[in-house]
Amino acid sequence: MASNPINTMDRFTSFPQEIQAIEALRKTRRSKIKKYPTVSVLLSTLRADDLSNVLDQLLAQTLVTFDLVLGLHTIELSASHKRQIAALNRRKVKVVIQKFTKDQTLGTILSTLASQSSGKYIAKMDDDDYYGPEHLRDLVDAALDTGAEVVGRAMNYVYLEPLQLTVRRFAPHGTQAVELWSDWVCGGTILAQRDVAEAAGWFGDGNTAVDRFMLSGVTNNGGKIWRTFGAGYIYRRTFTFHTYVTNYSKYLNGANEQVVGIWDHPIFGGER
């Protein structure tokens, strides 16, 4: 049964109050865990700079043991990337690398990476988002506590890159609601039991809606999805050839708070 100190929070909850509730929840959940299961991180990338950033974030993760299945979509590893991977290896993080051509879809890439994974859980991470050091461990904590087949984060923090603003969106409803059963979580935070994800067809073979493919497949098979708090993850919105053009007003109008730049707090990894 899940432990829920956060479920009494509402849109008037301050950031310090949110952090306090999260820390209490972590303490409760981790006091019950004797051993962590194996986790395979799935990462598809086609941007060298973003790969550098996410490799640094993986190196900072507090989850003691995990491995990385890395898909290079039309790019090559630089000397700097290789040094980062060597640092992961020294941390006993096994890194499996596969190259993919331009014509291969995102769904095909992620499904291929998932099929090569060995962990009891798979964790999808996106190269253009921001992850705090407790990210993976928080997700596993929630999975073990709730028994959910899939766990992921709410969309509470969004970085609007063209505006250089991070907005905090917190409400007891919609995509901002936390610590509850749901049919949706942020795609860049999906943690799923490997066998359940495989039965759902992994991420399909399309170029879009790959996260929804997985989540729908899980629920259609009778699996349950738990959405935990968003703090510790920042979803990045920008204008590029591979992301949707977004009306930023929906994020600004729904914001409880906003800060210039990327939110600077240890839960997000500190200053970037």
Regions from the language model: what does each represent?
Residues 115, 125, 134-204:
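Conserved catalytic core of nucleotide-sugar-dependent glycosyltransferases
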Residues 73, 125-127:
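Active-site acidic Asp-centered loop
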Residues 122:
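Short aromatic/hydrophobic "clamp" motif used to bind/position activated sugar donors
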Residues 1-60:
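N-proximal low-complexity "stem/linker" segments adjacent to membrane-targeting elements
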Residues 158-159, 228-266:
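Active-site donor/metal-binding and catalytic loop motifs
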